[in-house]
């Protein structure tokens, strides 16, 4: 992958090749959070079911980042997850689910279904929406992000009785030291990453450089 930095001598932006993890923590750098192993714990709202993810506790409005690059497949209200985002990886084998986002302003500005996002991009903000058939309701007691990961080896597995959701607790532990640094532009109000990122396997550098 490559990271865009500003040359201190010329002041011009340049793309610098880099090596390492192509995945980021779902929590932006500098924001406190905590979690515990809760995969498989029982949930009772609506119907009895196991918890198919990991709850990450933090402060209201904490920026949420895309763990892996991919395409936004789901965006909007779900009575269980509240305001949520579903992102499919570029190879279409992983589906990332981010739920219980902030009331009123759950998403990063301009986020839309069909949009491609890079790993580490701000996609939304932590909240406590959900557990309501009515939209935009805070019915979750504790502010947190529900983060889930579904493995999809065949499209028939996307929505069925044999979906494969995995325990992401160890993944979040691994990514805790690899967080995306972000900041809010005081003029536009948009949240941007401090070091723009380009996955060279998914997007040609010359295309990214044109942005």
Model-derived features: where do they sit?
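Surface-exposed, glycine-biased beta-strand/turn segments
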Residues: 1-83, 119, 172-211
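Structural recognition of the beta-strand scaffold that forms the well-ordered cores
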Residues: 55-57, 64-66, 86-88, 95-99, ...
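Short, flexible loop/turn elements at secondary-structure junctions
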Residues: 58-60, 76, 89-91, 102, ...
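Residue-level signal for secondary-structure boundary sites
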Residues: 64, 106, 155-157
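Zn2+-dependent peptidoglycan hydrolase active-site motif and core
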Residues: 66-110, 134-143
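Conserved, short, structured surface segments that act as functional micro-motifs
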Residues: 115-186
